[in-house]
Amino acid sequence: IMQLATGNEETENAELQAYLSELNRTMDRLEFQFRTGNTVVDTLLNMKYHEAVRTIPDMQMDADMLLFPDNLLIQSYDIGIILGNALDNAIEACRKLKGKESDAETFIRLSSFRKGKMIFIEITNSFDGNVIRKRQSEFPATDKADKEAHGIGLANIKNAAGKYHGAVDWSVNNKVFTLSIMLQNERS
C-alpha cells in the first residue's frame, strides 16, 4: 500500500487494481466460519477464531445468534473495540482453563438481539472460575504481571458503549463468564 501511495498516478491505478484483485482472491480463499452479515464483525470473528484454535484446537465458538440490523448506526470502529476486547478476554480465559484442566470444555458463545432502539450483545465463555476482584472497580482485575499494559479491555468496552448511551455488565456462574453490553442504535 505504501508503494502505491508513493507511485505516480498512471502506474498507481494499474497497481492498485492488481493489488485489490489479489486481495479479493485472497479473501475468497479464507475459510470463513462465521457470517453475521456485518463485514467488520465477520472479519474480526474469523480472525480471532483462527488465532484461538491454533493454541486451543478443540475450542468451540458459536456466533449463530450474533446478528446486527441492516440499519446499524453504531460505528464499525466501536463494534470492533467491543468485540475485539471481549474476544481477546474470552480466548485468554479459555487458554488459562485449558492450561489448568487439559480435558476441560472450552467455548465462546456470542449472541445479540434488538429491542426498540437498543441492541444487546452477550459474550459467554468458559473459564477457570477464578475471578480477581479489584477494590473500587466494577470490573475484574487482570492477573498478568504487567498490570499497566493489561486489564483495560473491559474499560475500553465500557467507553465504547458509553458513546451510545450504553452499559456493560458481567456475571459469573460456576465456570462460565458472561459479558453483557447494551447500546442505543444511534449515532453519538
Give names to the regions the model predicted.
Residues 33, 61-82:
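Conserved short strand/loop->alpha-helix "switch" segment adjacent to the catalytic nucleotide/phosphoryl-transfer site
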